[in-house]
């Protein structure tokens, strides 16, 4: 699973990385993003960057997976997070996981997570037993993983984006 910031890293280094990443599928290594991340890309104001990232996704063969979430709804048109119906973008979480996900979604001083989109992207990677490729900035990611690990066992293998330099 690619962190959204990793897509920006690939975009910034596209000349060097796209051809290398394109060969992953030949080695039976697949890259994924969630439907939430695709929605974030589609909301970008910079049309050139949006088209370029979508083209990179297509060239590399990045696959989209449904996001695991406890919420299915139609958001109001004025709400910034989603611009249309998000039914069909999600799979429901396991009932046993609902209490801790609800707790993690509440931002408090003792709960640094707060970002629901990042939380459900991470949860999706854990439940689908994927590696998670992140940028060098782990300040958002580490507290989230630490908190989530208190409630759900995971075998998430985290790779930082400098791993891409060795391809």
Name each model-derived stretch.
Residues 6, 37, 120-121, 139-141:
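Alpha-helix capping/helix-boundary segments
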Residues 1-64:
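Short, well-structured N-terminal submotif of metal-dependent ribonuclease cores
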Residues 111, 122-167:
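Acidic, PIN/NYN-like endoribonuclease modules and their adjacent C-terminal/linker elements
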Residues 44-47, 51, 91-93, 108-112, ...:
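Short, flexible/disordered intra-domain loops and linkers
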Residues 69-132, 138-139:
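Active-site neighborhoods of divalent-metal-dependent phosphate/nucleic-acid chemistry enzymes
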Residues 32-33, 67-68, 151-152:
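Alpha-helix boundary/capping detector
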Residues 39-41, 68-79, 161-167:
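A short acidic, often aromatic-flanked loop/helix-cap motif at beta-alpha or helix-coil junctions
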Residues 56-60, 64, 72-74, 112-116, ...:
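Extended interaction regions within the primary functional domain
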